[in-house]
Amino acid sequence: MIKKDKNELNEMEYLVTQENGTEPPFQNEYWNHFDKGIYVDKISGKPLFTSEEKFESNCGWPSFSKSIDDDEIIELVDKTFGMIRTEVRSEDANSHLGHVFNDGPKESGGLRYCINSAAIQFIPYDKLEELGYGDLIPHFEK
C-alpha cells in the first residue's frame, strides 16, 4: 500500500490536504489523465476512486461519479467563500480532497466528485497486485 507521511508533502499537497486549499484548474497532474487504475489518498494510501468512474467534466480537476467505498469518504457542509458546498475528506487521513456536486452524469447517479490531484496518487492497473491493491481488480471486470 502506498503511504506518504505528512512531513513529506510538497507545498501544494500540504496546502490542499491539511489547509483545505485548492490547486489551480487545468494545471494539476490528473485533470486530463484517463489511464486505467485507481486513485488513492495521498497520505493513507486508502483506495478512493477508479478510472472506471472518472469522466471529463471540463472543470479543470479530476472528476469521478462515485467513490470505491463510501465509508472512506467524509462529506461536510462547507460555507466558505460565500457559497454552500459539500466538502469531501478522506476518512482515514482526514485529508481535504475537494468537493462533491450534483451536476455529474445522470446515468451514473448524478454526482461529480471534484478532487484535487494534490490529494490523490494514481496506481496503474498493472501495478495493483504488486502494490497491495489486488482486491480491487474485480472493479475493472465487466
UniProtKB/Swiss-Prot annotation:
Q: Where is the active site?
A: 114 (nucleophile)
Keyword Oxidoreductase set for record: yes
Q: Which ranges of the sequence are coiled-coil?
A: none
Write down the chemical reaction(s) this protein catalyses.
L-methionyl-[protein] + [thioredoxin]-disulfide + H2O = L-methionyl-(R)-S-oxide-[protein] + [thioredoxin]-dithiol
Record-level Gene Ontology MF annotations = peptide-methionine (R)-S-oxide reductase activity
An example GO BP is: response to oxidative stress
Any keyword Amino-acid biosynthesis?
no
Write down a Pfam family by its short name. SelR
InterPro entries linked: Met_Sox_Rdtase_MsrB, Met_Sox_Rdtase_MsrB_dom, Mss4-like_sf
Q: Write down the EC number.
A: 1.8.4.12
Question: Where in the numbering of this chain does the MsrB domain appear?
Answer: 2-125
Could you say which protein family the record assigns here? Belongs to the MsrB Met sulfoxide reductase family.
Could you identify this protein by its name?
Peptide methionine sulfoxide reductase MsrB
Provide the gene name from the record: msrB
